[in-house]
A protein has these predicted regions:
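Bacterial Sec-dependent N-terminal signal peptides
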Residues: 1-19, 158, 190
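Short linear capping/connector segments at secondary-structure termini
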Residues: 7-10, 68-70, 136-142
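Conserved, well-structured interaction surfaces
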Residues: 18, 22, 26, 30-36, ...
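Beta-strand acidic-aromatic groove motif in beta-rich domains, primarily in extracellular
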Residues: 37-43
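Core domains of carbohydrate- and sulfate-ester-processing enzymes
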Residues: 48, 52-56
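TPR/Sel1-like alpha-solenoid repeat signature
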Residues: 114, 186-192
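Aromatic-lined, polymer-binding surfaces characteristic
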Residues: 130, 176-187
Length: 195
């Protein structure tokens, strides 16, 4: 018999209802805001999307990104790595808790998490090359021991997850226009094939 404080949300008493899973999925979407408002802008220094006019108005980290000098000490790249893996963790957390559960929006939530996890991995791959892959929640100590994947493993993960997401997600959304659709999953899958 496990007893949890009645006024606290814990891992043991959460993920029981459809609404709980919806909140978990929304936490995955919330992590996208971090990515859109900052990290993609910073990565844009590698292209002609952003121009680094002078070091006087910038930092060494941005200069290094602009010149494809990637070091572990680059604070911006470290922040990007941490934030994107946090997004993956959130998706894996929801997916892990969905095993064996029957909820009305199971397919939709699973599809959304698979899509977002693929989004994070795709952008990690484009930014850093092959990276460690975790398909489930992994304790931090164990996560440090996961080796970088091969390109084949990365493409396998992306194509499998996005194909499943495309099948599970609706093609359009009436009331929830800001949520991903099957068409978005097919679009990202096409981008993966073109990369």
């Amino acid at each position: 018999f496990e007893q949890y404080p009645s006024n606290d949300i814990t891992e043991g008493n959460f993920y029981k209802t459809d609404d709980d899973f919806n909140q978990g999925v929304v936490s995955c979407y919330a992590k996208l805001k971090t990515m859109m408002s900052f990290h993609l802008t910073e990565i844009g220094y590698r292209s002609d999307e952003n121009i680094l006019e002078s070091m006087a108005v910038s930092t060494q980290d941005r200069y290094d990104i602009d010149n494809f000098i990637e070091t572990a000490s680059n604070g911006i790249l470290s922040d990007i790595w941490d934030a994107w893996y946090n997004g993956i963790y959130r998706c894996n957390d929801v997916l892990d808790h969905m095993n064996g559960v029957q909820i009305p929006n199971y397919n939709k939530y699973r599809g959304e998490c698979l899509f977002m996890r693929s989004w994070w991995y795709f952008n990690l791959y484009r930014t850093f090359g092959v990276v460690p892959i975790a398909r489930t929640v992994v304790p931090p100590a164990a996560a440090k021991l996961i080796p970088r994947c091969t390109e084949e493993e990365m493409y396998s993960l992306l194509t499998e997850d996005l194909a499943e997401a495309a099948r599970l997600l609706p093609d359009t959304r009436n009331a929830e226009k800001a949520r991903v659709t099957g068409i978005a999953a097919y679009t990202l899958l096409a981008k993966v094939y073109l990369t």
